[in-house]
């Protein structure tokens, strides 16, 4: 050819080999070491050929051959793209686009198919790409004699990067040999075509045919091999001179070469060149086909094996689930056949199978050896880790695991069958022998017969089992992919069986949506060294006859090895099982992307573990510090978890996110706080109505549950017993002006109204000890000042309504927050002391009225005649059941009855001890839990019934009975009626007393306010998980207003009873059955409804008709219940416990916060101050000023806020005055509702 071809522009065709004339004689080649380093740095093969200048390639020989990697990279990159001939049309026939500027994103190529093949580029897309490239090609592709590195511009798409990265990890597949002549040429233009071919060969310095193969051998690259059935390919066909780079923008786009060369060629030659250079030849566009070889299914960068890796499906993000872990060991059965036997399981704590009895032991915290954890970490670091394995059956998983073990050189190829056989052995469980129905385990020996059950393919074989794992043919892989796309078949009816009782019981304890971890460890002698595999399945699947219960399996851990290895397989199995049951580790296992994530999670677990020294422990008390240290470690771990979210791959939250989260939490807390003040009159009351009344209809629908019926029966007796007890004592204190009938009617009426209108229907309103103390004090005040007691209560009721409206209007319920544990414990301790004192005071009074008689001879003349006459005259009148003296209302109480004092003592003590013992029996170990709870909850009614029967059976001894009228009547009809005249019954009530009644009204309001609001606070604790909310203002207004109105009818005012309300809430609490053995019970829901309280109030009101039965109850039995309430109220009072510490050496002090964080003398000082306040209250109660005791009690609030804060530090006050009481739902010995509240009964 006359004119020498011009050098191609570097930016236009980066893959053209430069002319040898442009290379210096001494230009060195690219060093092999630097090339390897650049491979590792850039991560893309042949990437340096794009980056380096043309002159730097002089080290390569001009005639070197190009392998299949060159072709693949050349085709898949954006540097050289063949376009169909239809794209080379005049500009007016094509839609032109703006050039690709730096501000525009490059057009994204279609992603590769899942099989790794490159999709065909559509013609329309090429038109757009060609038009966009044509605008910017003028400035970038102008031929220049010298090119600089800054002129190199290339674009590497994301798909290119992924494809090249996949190719880098796999060996290059054989490529076809180039034919001698690949492109058909017309005979008419053979000479011109040969000239063009020679010019191109001179420009690129590459010989075709055999010359390329020789040069290729010299360059050190393997000779490409032609694949059968594919057209051979020659690099010469992809070459064109540099002037053709911008041919699309030429004025004559149909001319395939430069102007000078085109003038020397005939038209046929030009057409041939057009066909060769512009057309999309199918043979050239054909994609490479390689021999199929299954790649490693291992996720992440760890342990990737060479081989073509098809592009996997994107992994769906794993959401951590609750976990169930089962440890199986390879042991011999009674027939000396190996099998997998379950030896332990973890739901939260470890449960081991006792070897001798084959029973499950008690749940306990797993204690691990430090060496086993180190061995586990080492095995995970060197073993096989397969993440997101896409298998549905145990045989498929086993084959993948075994092949991965062979690939990672853990086992020999000849051990493949033995390991596989070991993995597919049958599994046995301790519960199998208890089931006499269809056998649960299906033998895996006949594996072929199970394939149809697993896949529903009839007689077809399982590809996972019958085909080799590596090197399979493409057809098998396609069949497997089609099979995975099919929905999982339903279990065949032939092997379906009903779950056993043991399985159902265990499934109740496993959390919902839990996923299982199977741990398989054992000794096999055919292996020379241990082998390990950790598998996480892509989707959790149920593996037949593997687990004890049908729970889907997500993780598998396998450890096999010889007994000669210095490794305890059982301990390593326990270690990985304990790790998987740990919340932080199994969350990290779900989110792990590679092996390093698991190793990091193990290190985090070790950071929070406690190592005990190898010393002998003499007692459990020596291990108390271990539990304390462990709690500190867990607290630190939780704090770190809040700063850095757990799980692999998660970034820490930014400061903005933390601030936003705190604002949201603060806003939510402020919105849900019912004590927050609005600043408007009655604003809190309006918020209570808007919060609670929208749930009004659901309050009745939610009562349609059997548990509510059981709660009605239980709470009825729990409410009736105090009503009878306090009613009898109130009648004693007020000379029957207010007695049992008035208290029962008041409880019924106010209970019905409150359950219909109240904001928190779980509250049980009733009479309490503080109100009883006030009623006694006010009655004494009225008697000493010759005032009518019932009329004075009416005016107190009027002032109560006014005070309630004023408090609610000012949103004063927030003041309950200032009533701390310091005041509550003094109040509760005072009432308990009053209960205990009143019991023994009444008993002593009985002994004074009915003294004991000494034994004397019948003929003695020194016997007191008066007393004998009383005893002799009374004895004949006693009828069966000593009932004849019960109704002597007009004759007064009999005195000096024989054996009355002793029988009263027996009845009182018997009632107390029976009720107290049944309360303890509730949390004992006898009988099933349900029976114990029923007996314990009805302990007080059972004690009353037993002692009433004892009294009834003793016919000749008098005891004072409960005074209850017949029918619907007041206790003393001769003294009062149902309606009280506010102006006076027998004489006009003084006007000054109408106004002065404000003071006792304030005192009563203080008592009702404290009891009601503190009880509502206890019920509304967040640990109880109430959903409908409470209403402090609405409940206070209803209770106080109803008490004020009931005073017009001579009925006692009531308050929220703390113990009964907590008992009511506990009875309506549904505990979750999915509680791990050894774990605390968790609340599932609370039946928040109005029906149970409504029915209880109605039943208490109807109890007035059983007056005949109530009249059989001796007062001594009520004294026993009074003593029981006083003693049990002391439980849970920290003040009472600290009083014990005054008499106890410091070495015997309990391990509690206020002992460990506060010095002993400072703690005793705090106790002494509380004791001083208690003594002051008791002194006030013992004087004529006993009516003012609520005012003295409320003064302890400013005392704590002003005085104690100057004596004690904030840290000491938090330890001594913190409200640490939590709801009690479990069955710990000696712990019940009384331990939860420092409030009086």
Swiss-Prot record:
- Gene3D superfamilies annotated for this entry? Helical hairpin bin, Mannitol-specific EII, Chain A
Q: Name one GO biological process term.
A: amelogenesis
Q: Which GO terms describe its cellular component?
A: apical plasma membrane; basolateral plasma membrane; focal adhesion; membrane; plasma membrane
Which residue stretches does the UniProt record annotate as biased composition, category Low complexity?
A: 141-155, 189-209
Write out the biased-composition intervals (Gly residues). 210-219
Q: Which residues lie on this side of the membrane: Extracellular?
A: 848-900
Q: Keywords of this protein's UniProt record, alphabetized? A: Anion exchange, Antiport, Cell membrane, Glycoprotein, Ion transport, Lipoprotein, Membrane, Methylation, Osteopetrosis, Palmitate, Phosphoprotein, Transmembrane, Transmembrane helix, Transport
Per the record, the domain of life is: Eukaryota
The membrane-spanning stretches of this chain are 708-731, 737-774, 784-816, 826-847, 901-918, 934-954, 988-1010, 1036-1059, 1091-1136, 1163-1199
Lipid moiety-binding region (S-palmitoyl cysteine): 1173
Q: Where is the composition biased (Acidic residues)?
A: 120-133
What result is annotated for mutating residue 553 to A? In OPTB9; uncertain significance; reduced chloride:bicarbonate antiporter activity; affects function in osteoclast differentiation; fails to rescue impaired osteoclastogenesis when expressed in a Slc4a2-knockdown cells
Stretches the record annotates as Membrane (anion exchange): 708-1241
Q: Which residues carry this modification: N6-methyllysine?
A: 274
Reaction catalysed by this enzyme = hydrogencarbonate(in) + chloride(out) = hydrogencarbonate(out) + chloride(in)
Q: Where is this region: Disordered?
A: 1-240, 288-320, 449-471
**Which terms in the Gene Ontology molecular function aspect does this entry carry?**
chloride:bicarbonate antiporter activity; enzyme binding; monoatomic anion transmembrane transporter activity; solute:inorganic anion antiporter activity
Q: Which family does it belong to?
A: Belongs to the anion exchanger (TC 2.A.31) family.
Name of the protein described by the UniProt record? Anion exchange protein 2
Q: What is the lineage of its organism?
A: Eukaryota, Metazoa, Chordata, Craniata, Vertebrata
